[in-house]
């Protein structure tokens, strides 16, 4: 999951609160 696509990364980042 750490090497997911940029879309996935942005999704998790926003989830996080970034």
UniProtKB/Swiss-Prot annotation:
By lipopolysaccharide (LPS). One of its GO terms (biological process) is defense response to bacterium. It comes from the Eukaryota. It is an enzyme of class 3 (hydrolase). The keyword Hydrolase applies. Coiled coil: none annotated. GO terms for molecular function: lysozyme activity. Keywords: Antimicrobial, Bacteriolytic enzyme, Glycosidase, Hydrolase. It catalyses: Hydrolysis of (1->4)-beta-linkages between N-acetylmuramic acid and N-acetyl-D-glucosamine residues in a peptidoglycan and between N-acetyl-D-glucosamine residues in chitodextrins. Its EC number is 3.2.1.17. Belongs to the glycosyl hydrolase 22 family. Lysozymes have primarily a bacteriolytic function; those in tissues and body fluids are associated with the monocyte-macrophage system and enhance the activity of immunoagents. This is Lysozyme.
